Amino acid sequence: MTVEKKVLYLGDDDATRAAAYLCGILARYEIDFDRVDGGTSPRDDFQSKDYALYILSDYAVSNFRPGDMEHIVEAVEKRGSGLLMLGGWESYFGRLGEYNDSPIADILPVVLQNKDDRRNDSSPVLLRPTTLDHPIVANLPWETAPGVGGYNQFEPKEGAEVLLEGYRTRISWRNVLAATQSSVQQSDVQIELLEKLPFLVVSTALRGRVAAFASDVAPHWIGGMVDWGTPRIFQELPERLGKDLFVEIGCDYAKFFAQLVRWTGAF
């Protein structure tokens, strides 16, 4: 079976809503892709061909028909396709135990929790690369990366590589009454680091590459990261997804996810 040099992006509602963000990035970087909207099943011919990369983002297990997940696993293990999972209510364990005990869980580079793994933080979760040499995180200004607000919690499997760590923070006034508008100083603000989390985990143990990113690509979980980088990008979506659809996003946000897609799909 031939691997088609193309992405299959499954999940995130449709291109008029959350899916618009990743669709816009793929269009911007001229990465060819097909779509399966959240709440719908793959096409009838799904198991007759392979894609270079399968992206699962907030895509419920119940959408798959018998044999669909096994087809993805076989494509990754034996034929070199890539697999990328992004965070969401219906990713990883999610709200109701989506991918636990599934064939997909066996090849992910992370260990899923056995309970609701969704986390929402009112203070930003700051992302820190463990290396600047990997193609996914290279050539990006991580010192200015905004924090994210939501994510799925998981642990890396043995032998997998953690490329991004997330640091939960608490930001507060030391004395809100003393810090009046006319006398606010940087010393009046307190930032605490609460917890370190694996946030982007990858593996090359199989014939194809696999990656797990804890947060979503779309608001609200991705937080201010959607606006990371100037100049801002205005990107129209392909007309096949709908009429007059577009996104406005930060250039570094777009570059990061494009690099993640290209590495995982070996483009």
Q: Whereabouts are the PLM-identified features?
A:
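Short, solvent-exposed loop/turn elements at domain surfaces
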Residues: 16-19, 93, 171-174, 212, ...
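Alpha-helical scaffolding within the catalytic cores
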Residues: 38-43, 70, 195-199
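An acidic, glycine-rich "communication" segment
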Residues: 85-182, 192
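Short alpha-beta junction capping motif
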Residues: 6-12, 50-96, 204-207, 211-213
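Short, charged N-terminal beta->alpha structural module
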Residues: 6-30
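Extracellular ligand-binding/catalytic regions of CAZymes and related secreted enzymes
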Residues: 1-7, 76, 182-267
